[in-house]
Regions:
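Hydrophobic structural segments
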Residues: 1-180
Length: 180
């Protein structure tokens, strides 16, 4: 299937127009005018992501966070981030970025996180249009902040979790409302 057809189907669900102003989204590296047998989906593109894509013979990576965020001043291979871009180009791997639009879209990442964490009766954290918004605020069963943090850690398989509190006792504070 053409990469452009894959992206057309993806954008039928999650259009770029949902992206927040100034956000990087869409094709960032390569071309969509090529046949693709395998697609890799990633949160970030790191060296290992590129190795995995090459080994799997993936012709397209759909990624949440853009591999090129600031303008490149050069494209020399002795810089790790540049080497990633060079390897993607060398192996003809296209990169399509879907950042805030996958957060905003109904049943996107924000809604999925709420589902995983049993967050109910949600509303938008910030309205982005008449029908959409980024982030979610909702209700959870009453529990301590520490218990909810442990649930987040377990749900996402995290080794550690950074929590910002005013006092150590905040971990024992009861909460019923959270934001994603």
């Amino acid at each position: 299937m053409l990469a452009s057809e894959i992206i057309a189907r993806y954008e039928a669900y999650c259009p770029q127009e949902l992206s927040m102003e100034g956000d990087i989204s869409g094709l960032q590296i390569g071309t969509l005018d090529k046949e693709v047998d395998k697609v890799l989906v990633a949160l970030y593109i790191r060296e290992q992501t590129v190795v995995e894509a090459i080994e799997a013979n993936a012709g397209l990576i759909i990624v949440k966070h853009a591999p090129i965020f600031r303008p490149l001043k050069d494209l020399v291979a002795d810089k790790a981030q540049n080497q990633i871009v060079l390897d993607l180009i060398k192996h003809d791997i296209a990169v399509y970025v879907s950042h805030t639009n996958i957060d905003v879209v109904e049943d996107g990442l924000n809604d999925w996180f709420c589902q995983l964490l049993d967050i109910k009766e949600t509303s938008f954290l910030s309205q982005t249009s008449s029908e959409h918004g980024i982030g979610r605020v909702g209700k959870i069963a009453p529990q301590t902040f520490g218990d909810f943090a442990a649930k987040v850690k377990a749900t996402f398989g995290l080794d550690s979790l950074r929590m910002v509190t005013y006092e150590k006792a905040d971990l024992n504070r009861m909460i019923e409302r959270v934001a994603i």
